[in-house]
Amino acid sequence: MCALDRRERPLNSQSVNKYILNVQNIYRNSPVPVCVRNKNRKILYANGAFIELFSREDKPLSGESYIRLQVEIFLSSLELECQALGHGSAFCRRFNFHGEIYQIRMENVSFYNDESVVLWQINPFPDYPFFALNQSGSNTNTSDKLTIWNDLSPGTLVVFSFYMLGVGHATIARELGITDRASEDRIKPVKRKIKEFFEHV
């Protein structure tokens, strides 16, 4: 059997309580929002950063990403996906919350007593200014190049990253949950800006 096959990974020999204590020791004072939930979606542990993140007041008129319940429903659906993948599985996904983009990492951990938990770790997703640097007037060439990227939206940068790796628009659209046309439209301003830049070089 392949060494990377999750079916062959040994279950965690420690108890759930011991596992939670280990997580608590690592993340108690961490700025990274972290929680551990059981298969019934009950929070067994959440650090202060997690509690603070999800204590923001709802703003119903600002869209679904400003309503905590809507965001929690989306994250719970990801958690079910992680549980379905089985012990040892882990993945990262992006989500919007209160106008900010975050990346969540979920990991499924199973134990010998037939218990399992999902570890959540949340980070702010990199946003523009893209490759932000402290520029001095002495290096105008570098500053001009960075301006190309700073003017692009995060959504355009994500599509462009896939596009530069040779991924087709149909695949990009499927992975990002957008239409093929939207993927193509996001590339057009990048091509235009690059063309304008090199015409002046």
Swiss-Prot record:
It is found in: Cytoplasm. InterPro entries: PAS-like_dom_sf (IPR035965), PAS_fold (IPR013767), TraJ_R1 (IPR016384). Its main location: cytoplasm. One of its GO terms (cellular component) is cytoplasm. SUPFAM superfamilies: PYP-like sensor domain (PAS domain). One of its GO terms (biological process) is regulation of DNA-templated transcription. Keywords: Activator, Conjugation, Cytoplasm, Plasmid, Transcription, Transcription regulation. This protein is essential for positively regulating the expression of transfer genes that are involved in the conjugal transfer of DNA between bacterial cells. This is Protein TraJ.
